[in-house]
Amino acid sequence: MRQFVIDGKTVSDDSPAYVTAEIGHNHGHDIEKAVAMIKSAAGVGADAVKFQTRSPKHTYQASTDRGAFYCRSDNPQWMDQVYGIHREKLEFSWDEWVAVRDEARKEGITFFSTPFDFPSLELLEKLGVPAYKVASGDATNIPLIKAIAETGKPTIISTGGCNIEEVDQLYESFKRINADPKDLAILQCSCVYPATDEAMN
């Protein structure tokens, strides 16, 4: 029987659905909002809350040119900012991440995150997250996938936009390092927002 184990909970064909509340960056770097989202997710019975973790200085070019990399937003908080600066303002400090993790523990809900780069993976390791999620955009980022596999932790990888050869490559790259079948879940992902009913499982 196929099984995936995350934070001590087994997910299989015979188990109830594992529900993850995707918080991402919807907190807008507001710790009180993040805490409220965690409480809400726990209150409705979600199994986990998932965030996104980036190190914008390692991910985005520090360009000040107006144009494609500028935020176009009606929100005065973000209007006319370089995208990298905008992303940086969304990131929590170490102390804030600790507060987020501790709040999830207090509420009895699993906390994990999607690392978008190596510094973020290192930060999440220090926080002691029990699992990782890889975004579709990084499904072909084999160095990052290998680094995550080396943690020995359960990993969920979305494959939106990938062809079957790329899915095979990420699978083989992960399994060469972490061969435990209970540590890898691959999601078929439709990169259409919002997805039509016909595109969903």
Stretches with model-predicted labels:
Residues 1-201:
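Catalytic cores and adjacent flexible loops of soluble metabolic enzymes
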